[in-house]
Every structure is written in C-alpha cells, then in structure tokens.
Amino acid sequence: MTFAVLAAGEGSRLEHEGIREPKPLIRIGGECLIDRLIRIFLSCGADKICVVVNSRRPEVKAHLESLRCPELHIVVADTPSSMHSLRALAPILGDKPFVLTTVDTVFREEDFRRYLREGDFAVTPWVDDEKPLWIDTDGGGFITAFRDEGPCPYVSGGIYRLTPPMMQVLEQCIRRGEARMRNFQRALLAAGFRLRAFPMERILDIDHRSDIAKAESFLSRDILLVHRSMRYTKGRPDDRLLLNAVGRILQEEDFRISETSEETLTAEMLHRPLHCVLSMARNPETLALLANCPWPVVNTPRAVLNAARRSDEDAPAPCWVKRNDYAEHPSDVVFAPNEAARQQAVEAMRARGISDIVCQHHHEGREVKFYGAGRNFFRPDALPALREKALETAAEKGLEIWGGDAVIGADGDIHIIDFNDWPSFSSCREEAAKAIAHYAVHQK
C-alpha cells in the first residue's frame, strides 16, 4: 500500500505564535507529527511512503533521512499550494491507488485502520477549523457536495484515497489555474468519481499553538478524577460513589485513571497530557488552579462559579432563605412561612458568618429532582418540557454535568428552584455513570 504526505507548507501561523520547529517536527505526546504518520503507515502495511517537503526548512529532510526507512521516498519542492505539492509527488507515486494526508492531520489509529478498510475520503462531524470544507452525503454514504458554507453533517478530514485517473483531474485543475485542494475535490465529483465518505469521530489539524494541547489531550488515555471536599458533601458518600463508578467504566475502556481530592490537587498533576479532568471541585483555590489547566475540565471552573451564583432574589415570605453559594449544613436552606421567620433566618445565617444570602420565591406544586450529562442523558425522561428548560439553564451556565430541583405547578408551569454542578445522581447512579463516562471520552 502506498501513502503520501504533504509536508511542504510553511506553518506561518505557528511561527507567528512563537513555535520555532517546522510543523512536521512538532511533537505530540513526545512524537514528531511526521514520525507518527510514518509509524502508523508502516503498521498498516505500507510498502511506499512518499513525502514532499520544502527547501526552506532543511532540517525536515535531514530528520527524515535519519530515520533510515527503506519505504520512505522524499521529494523537495517549494510549491505555492497543496495541489502543487501533490503534483510534485506524482512522478514517484506509481500507478496504484494511494492514501494522502497532510502532515498535521491527527487521528486515532484505530479509526484510521477502519478507514483504510471501508472509506475513500475521511470526514468528521467535529468542526474545529477556521474555514472548514463542509460535506454532504447521500443515503449510501457517498459524497454529493463540497461546500464552503455550512452547516452540513460533516467537514473534510484531510485524508483521501486517490487513484491515477484522479491525478489526471488534478493536472487539469492546475492548468486551469486552480490552487486549493477543495476545488480539486469538487472537480473529482464533477468528473463523475464516486467518493465514499468515512466518518471519523474527530480529526484535528495543527494550525495554532493551542492545537498542540488539543491534540495531546485527544490522544491521551489518562483521565484525572478530582473528588469533592467533604465540606461540600454534607458528610454523604454519594458524590464519591458516583465518581468511582465513572472511573471503573473508563478503566474498562482502557483509560488510565488517577484520583485526587480538591484539597490535594497540585499543578504538577496537570502537567502531563490528560484526555480530560473530571472535577467535582468547588473550593475557590482549586478552581483557580483548574482555570489554568490546558486540558478539558468537566465542569469548567467558570461554569461551577456560574452554578454557585444562584440568583439575586429578595422574595417576600413565604420564601426559602438560602446561602447563595453551596449548602454545607441543613440550616443553610430554611423555609420562612412569614416575614418574621424570614428575618430570623437571615439574621441567623449572618451570625454564622454567611453574608451572601438569597430569599427565593416559594412555589406550590410537585417537587421533582432532575439530572443531566451533556445533551443526551436526562432523568426523569418522561418530562420533556422540564428537560428543555434544564438544558437551556445548563447552556446558560456552561455546565456539562448538572442537576437540580424543580417545582411543577398545578397549571403545568415549571420553576427551577435549584441548579447544581455534579450532583450525586443518587436515584440513577449506575446509568448516569455510563453516560458521564461516555461524555468524558467523546465530550458530547
């Protein structure tokens, strides 16, 4: 099998952001981008790997030559576009189909192996590009259109299976003055080629400094669990039981799990690449530490703080007098049936050193607890109107794992009276743990 890599670009955006290494030699998880591709191609049975590099960064060619890989063929060419770089490879590609990718395309190896068996053009629903090439497909999975404007179900993943007849179309495009790969792809459709799309969950490009951390996180099999302080659990073990259940499921999926508490979390624990951090932390110092974490944190510190700021209500009695961050004691939430009880509850909290207090409206009706993880898990699932209102609130606060309490009045009106980050999911812990583990892996 023949593979080809376009590695002749300048990487100007990365250079502008202070990255000195040429793009092919940028390391993801300790491995150069070009080395990673070559290793994967060889493991997939490559008998020829053709790479085009430019003359402006001779260290790339020198690095490739140092690999002493007999399957590797190097072309040096300074080209104005990716189409011209592909054309420079044409003389050494031979007369067989080949798989083409750019040097900065990052994917999971298992996804790539399935692509080789089943697809022609890799596509992904994951959009993280400034100017993605949107793709429409038909019911059989064949590409019907390449579009500059979305949305469409997929965007191009930058991995293509091409044939010698397709290279003739490339030559025609260049002779017409075309320079962009997306126009070459459109020309293939216009020429009647049937291009079978292969969806891959996520494919990343390294265009900016921040993309390096994204790629390392994407490929990492390490997940850190941060347990909530007993200060915020009211002495109950439910929170720890939930996070432990999530950790067991992730271990079964071959993730390496490490654990700490919000009191013992250190910056050093966040230095290695992490697929994500599942954090129940609420301590302000811990949230400040996590705010500087380069890896995905679920829930984000900003969202946790948003959840803590429940409201600025000052409702008259009858009402609920609440501590306006996190309840640590039963007396942090008090029902006041009249104004005297309301004032007494406020004064009692102030006497305990609590200054941030809200008085929340009391609503008559049926109280319901609800739980959510992302957009795909919600309990109780028999209340679609509550689900929509809860999802809207979660989006406003930026929460990914959430829950709370609502009152449903006799007229059907829904009032959300409490909304929290990382509830215990006590009534549905096992199924919630599966949903949270899925969200941790896929972050959707």
What are these regions (language model features)?
Residues 1-19, 193, 220-228:
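N-terminal nucleotide-binding beta1-loop-alpha1 segment
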Residues 3, 155-222:
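Conserved alpha/beta core of the MobA/IspD/sugar-nucleotide pyrophosphorylase nucleotidyltransferase superfamily
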Residues 60-137:
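Conserved beta-loop-beta/alpha segment of the NTase-like Rossmann-fold superfamily
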Residues 82-83, 130-134, 319-345, 366-369, ...:
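Glycine-rich phosphate-binding loop of ATP-grasp-fold ATP-dependent ligases
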Residues 107-182:
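Conserved core of the sugar-phosphate nucleotidyltransferase
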Residues 153, 334-397, 408:
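Phosphate-binding site of ATP-dependent enzymes
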Residues 220-222, 395, 399, 408-444:
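C-terminal active-site "lid" helix and adjoining low-complexity regulatory extension at the edge
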Residues 229-318, 326-327:
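Conserved N-proximal alpha/beta basic substrate-recognition cap immediately N-terminal to
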